[in-house]
Amino acid sequence: MAEEAKAKGNAAFSAGDFAAAVRHFSDAIALSPSNHVLYSNRSAAHASLQNYAEALADAQKTVDLKPDWPKAYSRLGAAHLGLRRHRDAFSAYKTGLQLDPDNAALKSGLADAQAAASRPPPTSPFATAFSGPDMWARLTADPTARANLQDPEFVKIMQDIQKDPNKFNLHLSDQRVMHAIGVLLNVKIQTPNHDENDHDADDDVSEDEVVSQPEPEHEPEAAVEVAEEEEEEEKETRDRKGQAQKEKEAGNAAYKKKDFETAIGHYSKALELDDEDISYLTNRAAVYLEMGKFEDCIKDCEKAVERGKELRSDYKMIARALTRKGTALAKMAKCSKDFEPAIEIFQKALTENRNPDTLKKLNEAEKAKKELEQQEYFDPKLADEAREKGNELFKQQKYPEATKHYTEAIKRNPKDAKAYSNRAACYTKLGAMPEGLKDAEKCIELDPTFSKGYTRKGAVQFSMKEYDKALETYREGLKHDPNNQELLDGIRRCVEQINKASRGDFTPEELKERQAKAMQDPEIQSILQDPVMTQVLTDFQENPRAAEEHVKNPMVMNKIQKLISAGIVQMR
């Protein structure tokens, strides 16, 4: 559905119907709100309609969803350019070019932003009035305006309008601003709060009287100084941030050289210059981590998380700080033997950003915790006692109770093959065949020479009517214990069942059950889907001479035997 709406939007955009394109892209976004391409397309449509504020919002959303996509910054730059924010447009295009230095659209946009920034602003009476060098002097020369300049709020308003004449529209209801524009444009602007007597009085004032008013010596200079101080403060902030970045780069270089003390010095200096970038804290934490100063690392990470939330920093940065803290806690846990705090922090980091590296560290911490618990619980003597209790209960046919004791024995000694063997026997008695098979295989894995493992596994497979597999298991066991009577009896029982199948001695119900079970076996499925075996089976029915040749092929006969054992094929 979202793709359909997107296609309609693209078609409308191509046809020049940008309003319709916006509607279609909005419909698509409602269906797929995390699709960055849809926001990008709608941003372009808004920009084509000269709705640059909406275009900017969509472009910013595109960047948030896909920060590594160069086109997102092309959209962002175009929106800023439409709003005449040349510096922001320049920054957006530069960021995009860092991702894709050869992108023609970004290069063109950057050139447009540079040209627009250097182009003189369009002249208008308001722009000229507010940008003139004598603005403050002319206002001071007027008695009413001079009185208004005593109010810092009014001075701030006039400074804002001087920086951006378009802000004049925000203050149309302010009598002081209207009077000031009248003074600067040399026109008479009547304000609603003046009554007729005021107009008459103003009309009676002569030009000489206006000129003869004493001019203050300091008010305009003070206003200009305020503006200059603010600009100087902004410049100083930019300079400090730039110096902080240089310190960070120097710290990174020292870190790569394993010069940790120097790296810490640079990161600390960066923090002094700019406390609004938490990467300085996380980088210093990384150095402390390498040095084994885990407590210092944790402190920096906690500061980074706290400061990051205050600044509403990127959630990825906060997640990075949490992951680094978790790593320090995990390393400390090797001594403290408490992995729970590290696990908790890793889980918290994953809620901020599901990062594969963090997930890997969480799994490692959980595994280490489990291994530690097993080490602390390990006691072969208690394991033997639990196994003996299980044996007594097994003899009493109390299989569920016996299973619990065998499980306890395994926890106490995970390497005890006998405990797995005995629990497999319990599971078989209880009809829990998959669990019994798993324990029997674990028993064989721990001790391949232990014949009980093979008898347990064979018994489970025999109970599951997988006679050919049980036969293979018993034969494998005989390799380690050739005279084991239990294994020999198992082989005899399997052969009887296989012969019974080949003679077709099963009841229809038994045959149907065996065939249904066999069809679930991937090996049986593979044999039946093999074109060569399909032809072989056909030859056995229709071409006796060809069948004689097939009988000489051991691989073919092995597969035929599997089908016979499964009840799929019967020999008559």
From Swiss-Prot:
Induction: By heat shock, heat, cold shock and wounding. Mediates nuclear encoded chloroplast preproteins binding to HSP90 prior to chloroplastic sorting. Mediates the association of the molecular chaperones HSP70 and HSP90. The tetratricopeptide repeat (TPR) domain, forming a carboxylate clamp (CC), mediates interaction with the highly conserved 'EEVD' motif at the C-terminal ends of HSP90 and HSP70. Phosphorylated. It comes from Glycine max (Soybean). TPR repeats lie at residues 2-35, 37-69, 70-103, 244-277, 279-311, 319-356, 383-416, 417-450, 451-484. SMART domains: STI1 (SM00727), TPR (SM00028). The keyword Lipid metabolism does not apply. PANTHER family: HSP70-HSP90 ORGANIZING PROTEIN 3, TPR REPEAT CONTAINING PROTEIN. GO terms for molecular function: Hsp90 protein binding; preprotein binding. Coiled coil: none annotated. Residues 235-253 have a biased composition (Basic and acidic residues). Expressed ubiquitously, with maximal expression in cotyledons, followed by shoots and flowers. One of its GO terms (biological process) is chaperone-mediated protein complex assembly. Keywords: Acetylation, Chaperone, Cytoplasm, Nucleus, Phosphoprotein, Repeat, Stress response, TPR repeat. This is Hsp70-Hsp90 organizing protein 1. GO terms for cellular component: cytoplasm; nucleus. Residues 198-210 have a biased composition (Acidic residues).
